[in-house]
Amino acid sequence: MKGKKTVLIILDGWGHGDKTKSDAIHHSSTLFVDSLYKNYPNCELKTFGEHVGLPKGQMGNSEVGHLNIGAGRIVYQDLAKINIACEDNSIAEMENLKTSFAYAMQNNKALHLIGLVSDGGIHSHQNHLYKLCELADKAGIKKVFVHAFTDGRDCDPKSGKGFIKQLEQNLFGAKIASICGRYYAMDRDKRWERVKLAYDLLTSGIGESSQNLTESIQNSYNNGITDEFIKPIISVDENKNPIATIQEDDAVICFNFRTDRCREITTVLTQTNMPDFGMNTLNLNYTTMTNYDSSYQKVNVIYNKANIKNTLGEVLEQNNKSQIRIAETEKYPHVTFFFSGGREIEFAGEKRLMVNSPKVATYDLQPQMSAPEVTATIVAELEKGETDFVCLNFANPDMVGHTGDYNAIVKAVETVDNCTKQVVEAGLKNDYAFIIIADHGNADFVINENGTPNTAHSTNMVPCFALNSGFNNIKNGKLGDIAPTILKIMEVETPTDMTGEILIK
């Protein structure tokens, strides 16, 4: 047979739940996806832990998922790598960490540690922060301040108070200078008015004054504000003055290892003046845990990413195949940068289509998001029948899953079921093969045992369907098996770098 043009649809956050009330997918009307189980070869994929290069049992996420899918192998992740480095103390030998410490010591400057404080393991891990506090203390730095971003998204919405209490036990002489919800400090959608609240807190100490941080967090909870949305809180001394703000010439380490959500705060602190928002850069000795953006000037990086060679996109380029990457804003970096193994620029023959995500405060307010527009855009492309490979992401089950709003999650799932149907029908008419998968679960586990909303990802298996592929059998696997499977359908030789298995036969 001649290789087939193939569409990969990633249903972001669509896992196999336990079919109880907590499983919003099971309680949604998903007639189309239900029909796929009956009519096409299907299997299950593992998306978490050691199956995607994370520590055992650690839930997967979109960045890790798309990296593994595009690479066609297990890609060992920063979380696992940095965990080991903290355990064996090899992090202490990292050149740019030593440089940051030496700068603070020699110039008698404050060292500010900024980032997400939780055990979510998606963007950061609190253990890495504890280690930095310990090493700064050993280095003899006297002025060490933590600016904590609270989570409530990759872990329970009211877990932040407990994480701050744990941090207070692991400061090694450092002090917590401020607290702010990730909604403001870790925006990634150019909502600069949100970022400004975090910027003003960090640089000017503008926020609610507090001498008891856990009490202030509890007050937020009492007012119906959960971790993600906690308004800026500044720690003050007995004279009501901030104990620390980030000043010109200070040292800053941003300890998030995931690259996307501390880009904006780093940009306004170090790269780009934004006079319209009253945000100007400071002259800082600024260090990040990983490389957030290779275009940054004067930002030091502790761990640079290894280049991933021979990703699916690169192999298609080598074989003169055309490809489309399409998603709405929220998942656009995932189908481009991450799917291409951390590469920003397009491959030859690659077309990128981004549909703007709706400008709403949270996606439970518009659970269909921009899926209908994404659908219309890609259907028009499939009807031309010209493109050899398409990677398409539907964001809804994940992004609405993070809100914890049950009815909205059901609407999101039903939207994606309907949109997937339209894409598949258009593709099959033009003889496309389809692989339909998820990168991790979320909407399949939305209520905790105690009845509270679960807004984090799940470690459930996810579905994988093969439509019109020319193969009738498919076996269970992992995300790193998808690229070799697609190359098999397209009759393109799999490079030896792709150690994933071919799931169809």
Which ranges hold each PLM region?
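Feature captures the catalytic ectodomains and active-site-proximal regions of enzymes
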Residues: 1-505
